[in-house]
UniProtKB/Swiss-Prot annotation:
The lineage of its organism: Bacteria, Pseudomonadati, Campylobacterota, Epsilonproteobacteria, Campylobacterales. This protein is one of the early assembly proteins of the 50S ribosomal subunit, although it is not seen to bind rRNA by itself. It is important during the early stages of 50S assembly. One of its GO terms (cellular component) is cytosolic large ribosomal subunit. NCBIfam families: rplM_bact. Part of the 50S ribosomal subunit. One of its GO terms (molecular function) is mRNA binding. It comes from the Bacteria. SUPFAM superfamilies: Ribosomal protein L13. The keyword Glycoprotein does not apply. Signal peptide: none annotated. Pfam families: Ribosomal_L13. Transmembrane segments: none annotated. This is Large ribosomal subunit protein uL13. One of its GO terms (biological process) is translation.
Amino acid sequence: MNMTKMAKANEIKREWVVLDAEGKTFGRLMTQVATLLRGKHRPDYTPHVDCGDFVVIVNASKVVFSGLKLEAKEYFTHSGYFGSTKSQTLQELLEKNPEKLFRLAARGMLPKTKLGRAMLKKLKVYAGAEHPHTAQVTK
């Protein structure tokens, strides 16, 4: 009887994937990123093991949104104190900190566990075209 092979954490060979966000739709790009971070594109995918690849996103500030999302969509933060709710529109967040925008979207698509936090650490986002990971990049 053949048993299904389960990947072990020390057997996984991770790759570095660079994605250029310029001119791409945000949501479609982020689903691709979540799949790569989770490792679901691999034949040895195991749900309880972090088997995803490192993902480097460049030109994050040049990503495209459909519809009126730039003006209408809002992101809220709350410190826990009364009256401390702050909101930013998508356009403000994209101009000030595009890295945070990509990290928030990826966090929503990954598991809400220790494993998900480990997966999120493998996401590297840069607003411009330059990144310091040229030595590691394989794809």
